[in-house]
Amino acid sequence: MINISNILDLTNYAFVLFFGITAAFYFVGMHFEDNKKQYIFTILVFGCIQLIAYLLLGKQTLYTCYPLLIHLPLILLIFFVFHQSISMSIISVLTAYLLCTPRKWIGTLVSSFFGYNQDIANAAAILVTIPLLILVIKYLSPYVEKLK
């Protein structure tokens, strides 16, 4: 059934996917300006995988299987298709994963003022995604990229 909670859940998953793929690509030196087609294709394909898993398997199974459905294939994509070292492929995805945590923290903090309402947590996490991603790209990605 489609309701506001499901829409916020799906939107939050879409934003975290966008954040993770974009951050991981920047960490290996794949900047959006030079790789627009790769970004769009990757986000669309992984978004479809995520949506299908969400609809067929449910939210909890998607959350549990996320490393196998998204992280591992993204590592393999960066390594085999985009020809980055395996160590940088792993580091970029795991660093992006780690940096998704502040989104969740901020969402939880904001929702704590509203009885830990999950819809509020999702909305707050969605709202901080782009500003956080800009900070990560501008201030952190140049340092991670130097690990090559």
Predicted feature locations:
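Short, charge-rich amphipathic segments
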Residues: 2, 26-29, 39-46
